[in-house]
Design a protein with these regions (language model features):
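Extracytoplasmic/peripheral linker and loop segments enriched in polar/acidic and small residues
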Residues: 1-5, 9, 29-30, 95-105, ...
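Append "and occasionally in soluble cytosolic enzymes with long acidic Gly/Pro-rich linkers
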Residues: 1-85, 89, 188, 231-233, ...
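Gly/Pro-rich hinge or "lid" segments in bacterial periplasmic/extracellular proteins
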Residues: 34-39, 252, 261-271, 278-281, ...
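Surface-exposed, Gly/Pro/Thr- and Asp/Glu-enriched linker/hinge segments
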Residues: 56-60, 103, 166-167, 184, ...
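Short helices/loops that flank or line small-molecule/ion binding pockets
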Residues: 81-90, 103-118, 355
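Long beta-strand-rich cores associated with HINT superfamily self-processing modules
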Residues: 141, 145, 207-255, 259-270, ...
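Extended alpha-helical stalk/coiled-coil segments
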Residues: 675-754
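C-terminal membrane-anchoring or membrane-association module
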Residues: 772-788
Length: 788
């Protein structure tokens, strides 16, 4: 328990974007209800012409069969079996197809859905980091990115959703004017995805990992955990030179290392390849492991933007790749929303793993070959999924300008409300990079020889191998192609020529070919990169790979660089609830822990109806304490005695995860109190009436006594004084008796009043009594005068 959470959309309860979409996500009160599900299934199946015979569905005399690919390596085996059993109970015949990673991936992602080789698959995804603002929801829900059934392979059946494509492309390209507009678009995208639900999100898992007690230097990535690019770079055991890491797989048939890393459709589409490759390559830009904001890694940047509606002129000495004529052309005259200046010194003053110095030629060839696959008709036809994904981002690049001192300007038609995201979007240097000569040899094998493909779906559609630089057979073909290039004197000069500037030479190309060939012959793979470790050997059959520290003196980082210690994650500790009374304000105190100043967003839902009644933000009391305030107007609309759910999502700007907690409160019913007040009021009225009658009698007696005094003034002074004293004493006794009775009544009334919540009426009653006592006091004053 506690190592997972239910999912409704692809966002988890720990994602920052969950906060702004919490009302949408929680509006769908999904729950396990097989009876209700069967009712809906029965209605739809009969409407489609199916018959239920003996508890099983038939169509055209044949059982309705669902082909269910169930992964066996983890919890998905149990999830798959549970879902399959419920489908069988609902009347379907389920063909349970138990598979490990490789066969499952090939069946699902490398086949035309129209072949009906599968209908349901227990898909799973690993995370490589945390994002504060996700700009690419289309990767999971929109057809244009090639990661939906059909996989953008020409000739295959394709899932289509034009509105999802349009909205996710706008989000991807930054086509919004404010954060608020972006959030509205994101909410609409999630709603559309829920309505179609090609992917049904079930649960997110919180992984626990086992490590030696003496292992130190592990960085914390609150989104990726041990999958992070950062985690192992500074890890060590004191006194030992080696680290042995356990992984479920080092290689599967889906584990593909190739230079065309494009979202989820090129190389590196599985966690098993990515986890290893991250140790061998340095990104230019990465994601902060706490905040989820893009940060410089092996480059630095400066951002200048004209905003969502402004423009910046692209200078004539900026260039763009012309895929039709295969050359760099001036981009002068174009306009862009933003320009980012990157300093690539820490790349360009260092070496590749095979000893050749990294140069701008590597960057220029990489950018050009991506424009080629995106916009060259022949190449895009060979790699349609990769082309469709790349073209959307490359359309926004308006020019590249080479500056002195290893700096490169990138002009892009893109804006975001956080400049760091503009820099990330403009980044040309890929996370996983190889030298240009390896890319060139791979391109020739794909586009010229047509022996390999960069994408998994395209490889199956074309009937060729999916290029994998760590497999010995594939590496041998790359080496052979490099040898041809060396022999031919192959030199793609146009790739390196911008105006009058040329960034590579034929002699430099020949040296690169020879050095890369030597690497391939020695290591029996062609993964050459630039990170803190190099891939020394890879054995797919033995499921082992060996990575060795790259000790080249030109490598820019030293031990301790890029280390991120553990921090306190955001966690709600308690919710303090006040009494909620209709028509009165109410408060809830939220105490939490975590980095920085904490904030909360809350939601109130009617438990009986499921309706969301309020969504709002907390007030800050202290950095770790927040106050939720409900207005009298809001509470006046709550039903006395009803139960309501309070859902609180607490977050920090310093750590892009959230903590979600739920609690319940009821609303105080005032009906019993009102009945008690009514009873007390009646009793108070009756007693005051009795006291008034006693006082009237006393006053009448006093008047009679005074009259008697007047009539006996002719008596002797002693007799008069005696009679007056006797009469006054009699009146005094009667008044005292009435006063004592009144005092007792007051005490009784006070006791009753304390059992009610309406102090105001009691105060009014006491005020009336005070007036009466004043009258009594006035009546008693003549006695004192008479005795003077």
């Amino acid at each position: 328990a506690g190592f997972g959470a239910p999912m409704v959309v692809y966002l988890t309860p720990w994602d920052y974007d969950y906060i702004t979409n919490i009302d949408l996500i929680l509006r769908y009160d999904f729950r396990y209800d097989p009876a209700y599900a069967s009712q809906i299934i029965d209605e739809r199946m009969r409407a489609l012409g199916a018959e239920k015979i003996g508890g099983k569905w038939y169509y055209g005399g044949k059982p309705v069969t669902i082909k269910f690919v169930i992964r066996v390596e983890d919890e998905r085996r149990q999830i798959g079996d549970a879902i399959a059993s419920d489908l069988e109970k609902a009347g379907f015949t389920v063909e349970r197809m138990y598979m490990e990673f490789g066969p499952a991936i090939e069946t699902v992602y490398d086949t035309d859905p129209a072949e009906f080789r599968w209908q349901i698959y227990t898909e799973g995804w690993g995370r490589t980091g945390i994002l504060k603002y996700d700009s690419d929801p289309g990767a999971f829900i929109a057809p244009w990115e090639g990661n939906m059934p059909g996989w953008a392979v020409e000739g295959w059946w394709q899932y289509q959703n034009a509105e999802l494509d349009e909205l996710t492309q706008k989000l991807y390209r930054g086509e919004f004017a404010s954060r608020e507009e972006r959030d509205r678009m994101m909410k609409r995208v999630l709603e559309l995805a829920l309505q179609d639900s090609v992917r049904l999100w079930v649960a997110t898992r919180l992984d626990s990992y086992i490590a030696r007690e003496d292992l130190t230097g592990i960085s914390q990535d609150i989104g990726a955990g041990l999958r992070s690019l950062l985690v192992w770079r500074n890890a060590y055991v004191l006194g030992k030179s080696d680290l042995t890491l356990g992984h479920l797989w080092v290689w599967t048939t889906r584990t593909t290392w190739n230079p065309m890393q494009v979202a989820l459709v090129g190389g590196f589409v599985d966690v098993y390849s990515v986890d290893q490759a991250y140790l061998t390559s340095d990104p230019s830009t990465w994601i902060h492991p706490y905040t989820g904001i893009p940060i410089p890694f092996r480059s630095s940047w400066e951002v200048r933007t004209a905003g969502p509606t402004g423009s910046i002129n692209v200078p004539a000495d900026a260039y763009i790749w012309d895929a039709e004529n295969d050359r760099w052309v001036s981009a002068g005259g174009a306009t862009a929303k933003s320009v980012v200046t990157f300093d690539y010194s820490r790349f360009l003053q260092s070496n590749w793993h095979h000893g050749i110095q990294i140069s701008l030629a590597d960057l220029l060839y990489h950018v050009a070959t991506r424009f080629e696959v995106a916009f060259d008709k022949e190449k895009s036809a060979l790699e349609p999924a990769i082309s469709g994904t790349l073209s959307e981002s490359l359309k926004t690049i308006k020019g590249i300008r080479i500056l002195p001192d290893n700096r490169v300007e990138v002009y892009i038609d893109y804006w975001f409300f956080d400049n760091a995201y503009i820099a990330q979007f403009a980044e040309l240097w890929p996370t996983l990079m190889v030298p240009w000569e390896v890319i060139a040899a791979s391109d020739r094998l794909n586009y010229v020889e047509k022996k390999y493909a960069y994408g998994g779906a395209s490889s199956r559609a074309r009937g060729v191998s999916w290029l994998n630089l760590v497999l010995a057979e594939h590496a041998s073909d790359v080496v052979a192609e490099l040898d041809k290039m060396h022999t031919e004197g192959f030199f793609p000069a146009s790739y390196f020529t911008l105006g009058n500037s040329v960034f590579e030479t034929p002699a430099g190309a020949q040296e690169r070919y020879s050095t890369a060939i030597d690497w391939g012959n020695e290591h029996r793979h062609m993964w050459i990169s630039n990170g803190p470790f190099y891939l020394d050997s890879f054995d797919s059959a033995a499921q082992t790979s060996v990575l060795k520290a790259f000790r080249d003196p030109t490598y820019p980082f030293k031990p301790g660089d890029n280390f991120y210690p553990f921090i306190t994650p955001v966690q709600i500790l308690r919710i303090g609830k006040g009494t909620v009374v209709p028509g009165s304000s109410a408060q809830f105190l939220i105490d939490a822990e975590g980095e920085g100043v904490l904030k909360s967003r809350y939601l109130i839902r009617d438990v009986a109806t499921g309706q969301i009644l309020a969504v709002g933000d907390s007030e800050s009391v202290t950095p770790k304490r927040m106050l939720i305030r409900l207005s009298p107007d809001f509470t006046s609309k709550l039903t006395p005695g009803a139960l309501y759910e309070l859902i609180v999502a607490t977050y920090s700007e310093d750590a892009a995860t959230i903590s979600v907690s739920r609690d319940f409160f009821d609303v105080l019913s005032l009906a019993p109190v009102e009945r008690e007040i009514e009873a007390v009021s009646k009793e108070l009225t009756d007693r005051l009436r009795a006291v008034s009658e006693d006082l009237a009698t006393a006053i009448s007696g006093l008047s009679t006594a005074v009259s008697n005094v007047d009539s006996k003034l002719d008596r002797t002074a002693d007799n008069i004084r005696s009679e007056v004293r006797s009469s006054v004493e009699d009146v005094r006794a009667r008044v005292d008796a009435a006063t004592n009775t009144l005092t007792n009544d007051i005490r009784n009334l006070q006791a009753v009043a304390q059992s009610t919540l309406t102090v105001a009426q009691i105060v009014m009653a006491l005020a009336v009594i005070a007036i009466v006592l004043s009258v009594v006091s006035v009546i008693r004053r003549p006695k004192a005068a008479a005795t003077a």
